[in-house]
Amino acid sequence: MTELLPLNTSPLPVKLRVEDYLLLDESGAFDAYRKTELIEGEVYFMNAQHRPHARLKSRLHILMAAALQKIDANLEAVVEGSVAMPPNNAPEPDIVITSEAEGDGLIPFASVRLIIEVSDSTLAFDLDEKLKAYASAGVPEYWVADVNAKVIHQMWAPEGEAYTERREITFGEPVDATSIEGLSVSTASL
């Protein structure tokens, strides 16, 4: 059966699907841009990471890995692993907590328990577009580590394009995950 498309009187953008994005990536279409990610069907070029961002991400990864090991949760903290969130998202968060770190291709969405973004110049984007994409997909918990304000925005209970629960934790205070029982991350060294 042929699907009839509505008559458009003006041009409309086309959102890329994850499979379109992967084909373009594999063909080398994004080689000149170093790193990209797909958010709501649009391809975004990712900025270079300066020392404050890189340092915070590195320390947070070490702390998260140690905290996961303590609770023996069969989960792993993966740095900069792209996540398949069909149909229109393939983000590359700073840290992904997943039960399927091994394997080929993108991290399967069903394995994701928590996503962490480290933000300096990207704070507005991470708390708006990325938050909507993660909540819409049903990411159980989302943290945004704000380099400049020295806080972690912790969000959980996704509903539609938002998280219904959130709190702000100052660096130095522990962060208790809501989606992973027993997981508490010390932020004293951040």
Q: What do the PLM-derived regions correspond to, one by one?
A:
Residues 1-190:
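Gly/Pro/Ser/Thr-rich low-complexity, intrinsically disordered segments predominantly at protein N-termini
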